[in-house]
Amino acid sequence: MSQIKNPFSEILSAYSAAIFEKDVDRYLSLYSDDILIFDMWNDWYLQGLQPWREMAENWFASLNSEKVVVTASEIQSHQFEDFVVGYAILRFAAIDAEGHELRYLNNRVSINMRQADGNWKIFHQHSSAPIDGKSIQVMFHMDDV
């Protein structure tokens, strides 16, 4: 029985593994050189692999002995010949060396990928979380909604 490969699901799996291992090179291998990131943290946007590398190096180093487990839900994607757009809710859970969950947050992600030389690469990634209209606070947990 053959299985149909879903490039978006494969990228999410590789993304989760690279983050769990805190492997900067593996993480960056998912992205095209001309990546444009609209991230939730610190900057309005990041353009290119070098700023994204610096972000990843700083993030992974800040974790010390903690690891981050990324799980995806509500996954949807649309594939065209050499283009994929996908959407998901990501849960980032920090765990200690014994595997105990310390904290977590959710965020929404939209990813655009294109195929080059037989490989799918992310060329645009946008992450967000809703803002409560009354408190003007970011809602980092889906159960806050």
PLM features per residue range, with description:
Residues 2-26, 36-145:
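A beta-strand edge to alpha-helix "cap/lid" segment located at domain peripheries
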